């Protein structure tokens, strides 16, 4: 085991000098004793002359030149398997929940090759989420990749927690949650939410939160993914939740300049597409098992053309776009039904009835969008009878796309609702065909199935 010495420390980036004949490989883990703390460094570049440039997987406070550094001669390895379920771990797989050792039987390196072409499998099976707007407009595929896109404060994390609750309870498989650069409070809330709904023993939690150094945030997604890959390779269907994939990119940006790379567009790292690809290509389903992933994607300044969300788009099967405009109307989940897409929305996959209903809903909402300008200038009275009907139905559809969430009961005061796909299609089809034209639009707001809307109308 070779030993080197620290020669330079710039924030999270540490340069270490080794003997010329024992230079560590790229991605090898190094260990340094920083006072009472053990700090792990990951090799990023070999600079020549025996010097390697590394990223610290923890705070570099207190490091000084001349400290001894050990080469562990392997990449960072984390615990995998059933021992990780119900536990909270950090980027190195160390427990942070005060419940003692993990007690794992196996450890895997966090850098692994993506599955080869012949190992990949293609599934057309739908995953029901119980959230009306998602099941109807952008259905999820089992073993597919889903992105929740939204600016600050439009409900990405709440939507994700609802999805985890619904899918974990209904689907009863294992899940891995990777908290990448998010609020510690949300991580804490999430743990208690899982404990209260009795699914904590089926979830592994890996956190590298906002206050952690960039090295942790850059690698914690890989730690969570490695744990999910182990479950997949045992032949299971796993769910991988990443909140938030944008912070993974951001952590890469933070260390990129310190590693001496020229910034590219908007100051992002030049290797943005490659870093994203390395992560996303591993999140895939094989003939042995599947990984279904749901990723929250923060959209800087609500601009979907920003390089980071734009790079993420290319890798996804379904995109759920959360809109500030819809949130401002008080309609939650604030999913934009005209912007959200899914590869599964194909009559050969979802069936003709589902496809026609979804496209019908979109065309009514699109027409309403076009008529809004006329209404703003001339008022409703100037519209033709046909257009008045379209507007009335569109407003009902818009309200019926809202739904009370289980995880938001504390805020809304109304009990959460899980709506089956069959009921969702029936409800929207009925509104489009004019079966509920006699009901007031308020009856459709924050209800589950269409029967509840009819009941609510009687009380208004």
Curated annotation (Swiss-Prot):
Its EC number is 7.1.2.2. Keywords: ATP synthesis, ATP-binding, Cell inner membrane, Cell membrane, CF(1), Hydrogen ion transport, Ion transport, Membrane, Nucleotide-binding, Translocase, Transport. Belongs to the ATPase alpha/beta chains family. Coiled coil: none annotated. It is found in: Cell inner membrane. The lineage of its organism: Bacteria, Pseudomonadati, Pseudomonadota, Gammaproteobacteria, Enterobacterales. It catalyses: ATP + H2O + 4 H(+)(in) = ADP + phosphate + 5 H(+)(out). It comes from Escherichia coli O9:H4 (strain HS). Its main location: membrane. The keyword Ion transport applies. It is a peripheral membrane protein. ATP binds at residues 150-157. F-type ATPases have 2 components, CF(1) - the catalytic core - and CF(0) - the membrane proton channel. CF(1) has five subunits: alpha(3), beta(3), gamma(1), delta(1), epsilon(1). CF(0) has three main subunits: a(1), b(2) and c(9-12). The alpha and beta chains form an alternating ring which encloses part of the gamma chain. CF(1) is attached to CF(0) by a central stalk formed by the gamma and epsilon chains, while a peripheral stalk is formed by the delta and b chains. This is ATP synthase subunit beta. It comes from the Bacteria.
